[in-house]
Swiss-Prot record:
Keywords of the record: Acetylation, Acyltransferase, Cell junction, Cell projection, Coated pit, Cytoplasm, Cytoskeleton, Membrane, Methylation, Phosphoprotein, Transferase
Site entry: Crucial for catalytic activity: 58
Phenotype for residue 61 to A: No effect on catalytic activity
Annotated protein name in UniProt: Alpha-tubulin N-acetyltransferase 1
HAMAP family to which the protein is assigned, alphabetical: mec17
Originating species: Homo sapiens
Gene: ATAT1
Ranges annotated as biased composition (Polar residues): 342-354
Family listed: Belongs to the acetyltransferase ATAT1 family.
Region of interest (Disordered), residue spans: 196-235, 252-284, 306-402
Subunit structure of this chain's protein: Component of the BBSome complex. Interacts with AP2 alpha-adaptins, including AP2A2, but not with AP1 gamma-adaptin (AP1G1/AP1G2); this interaction is required for efficient alpha-tubulin acetylation, hence clathrin-coated pits are sites of microtubule acetylation.
Impact reported for residue 108 to A: Reduced activity
Length: 421
């Protein structure tokens, strides 16, 4: 490959090694600084043209080797020139090979993943006019000696069929290890330990300081033992104790504030797994008898007394209080009941109280008649007012008082004979 400038003046050696800085070789005596800047521009032109020729030979859509990529990556290029051919005394370029270290994940013979950082063949090109003349072997062998590696320790990026035949012919590399990426490795790749890339100057300083400093390293921190997977449960009973919320009982049992106390023993797994982690097991409700007893103990409101005096059998409180009474007493408490005479069929205490009430009423009426006969001359008047019952005693809201028994209901029925229908 020919160029319009002098290649021999640019590359004094047959094989020239260039890194990412693209600096020209040692300056010849008598060269000036502007001339050196022009030499670097010429090197960039050579690399760009070699990359285009390689992409065309491999049928690639874009070149993979260029001066800009060389400056942004830590790759090395080996350039081979033809010193014998001197067209117009300027020399020519035969080919090049680009290598670099890359971190790869490759599979071994047992299909196990391995993280390695081998030296990779990234691009290799020899001009078509000088192929099969030993130039490729010469360039490849020089690179192996310079990098101090063996052919089977290399990883090749997207090799062409010509390159695979070249390696099989000169280095007996035929059996490959299948990979999931675009790199190809050969049998024996894992037989030797790969040489890591050249350490930087900063890493070398740190390594030297560590070798000189006799301070012992800090002991490694011990990690807690890992729990066995068999002990792990999705929702364990012990982990959910703090999530349980006490269920508030119904009114009126929720007057006194209650604090939710955690249970002494966690519930069994059968009962705990049936509930949500945010809700605990529901508490049983209070029986109806206890609820009615608590209602009787509650002091009434003053307006309830007036309502009871106006409508003794129709107030909701009276209906709640007589819910547990026998049917006979319930019928007697209603104004429209037809069971007014039922007072001796039931042997309970309600019927006994009703009998005592009737007897006291008769005694009161007899005493009033005697008092009227003693007043005046002793003759009965023609028109006398009907005897009025004395004012009932003051109603007392006490447990077991007259207001809750059948006698009080009977007295109310005698004073009020009006029927709702």
């Amino acid at each position: 490959m020919e160029f319009p400038f002098d290649v021999d003046a640019l590359f004094p050696e047959r094989i020239t090694v260039l890194d990412q800085h693209l600096r020209p070789p040692a300056r010849r005596p008598g060269t000036t600084t502007p001339a050196r800047v022009d030499l670097q521009q010429q090197i960039m032109t050579i690399i760009d043209e070699l990359g285009k020729a390689s992409a065309k030979a491999q049928n690639l859509s874009a070149p993979i080797t260029s001066a800009s990529r060389m400056q942004s990556n830590r790759h090395v290029v080996y350039i081979l020139k033809d010193s014998s051919a001197r067209p117009a005394g300027k020399g020519a370029i035969i080919g090049f090979i680009k290598v670099g270290y890359k971190k790869l994940f490759v599979l071994d013979d047992r299909e196990a993943h391995n993280e390695v950082e081998p030296l990779c063949i990234l691009d290799f090109y020899i001009h078509e006019s000088v192929q099969r003349h030993g130039h490729g072997r010469e360039l490849f062998q020089y690179m192996l000696q310079k990098e101090r590696v063996e052919p089977h320790q290399l990883a090749i990026d997207r090799p062409s069929q010509k390159l695979l035949k070249f390696l099989n012919k000169h280095y007996n590399l035929e059996t490959t290890v299948p990979q999931v990426n675009n790199f190809v490795i050969f049998e024996g790749f894992f037989a030797h330990q790969h040489r890591p890339p050249a350490p930087s100057l900063r890493a070398t300083r740190h390594s030297r300081a560590a070798a000189v400093d006799p301070t012992p390293a800090a002991p490694a921190r011990k990690l807690p033992p890992k729990r066995a997977e068999g002990d792990i449960k999705p929702y364990s009973s012990s982990d959910r104790e703090f999530l349980k919320v006490a269920v508030e009982p119904p009114w009126p049992l929720n007057r006194a504030p209650r604090r939710a106390t955690p249970p002494a023993h966690p519930p069994p797994r059968s009962s705990s797994l049936g509930n949500s982690p945010e809700r605990g097991p529901l508490r049983p409700f209070v029986p109806e008898q206890e609820l009615l007893r608590s209602l009787r103990l509650c002091p009434p409101h003053p307006t309830a007394r007036l309502l009871l005096a106006a409508d003794p059998g129709g107030s909701p409180a009276q209906r709640r209080r007589t819910r547990g009474t026998p049917p006979g007493l319930v019928a007697q408490s209603c104004c429209y009941s037809r069971h007014g005479g039922v007072n001796s069929s039931s042997p309970n205490t309600g019927n006994q109280d009703s009998k005592q009430g009737e007897q006291e009423t008769k005694n009161r009426s007899a005493s009033e008649e005697q008092a009227l006969s003693q007043d005046g001359s002793g003759e009965k008047p023609m028109h006398t007012a009907p005897p009025q019952a004395p004012a009932p005693p003051a109603q007392s809201w006490t447990v077991g008082g007259d207001i809750l028994n059948a006698r009080f209901i009977r007295n109310l029925q005698e004073r009020r004979s009006t029927r709702p229908w």
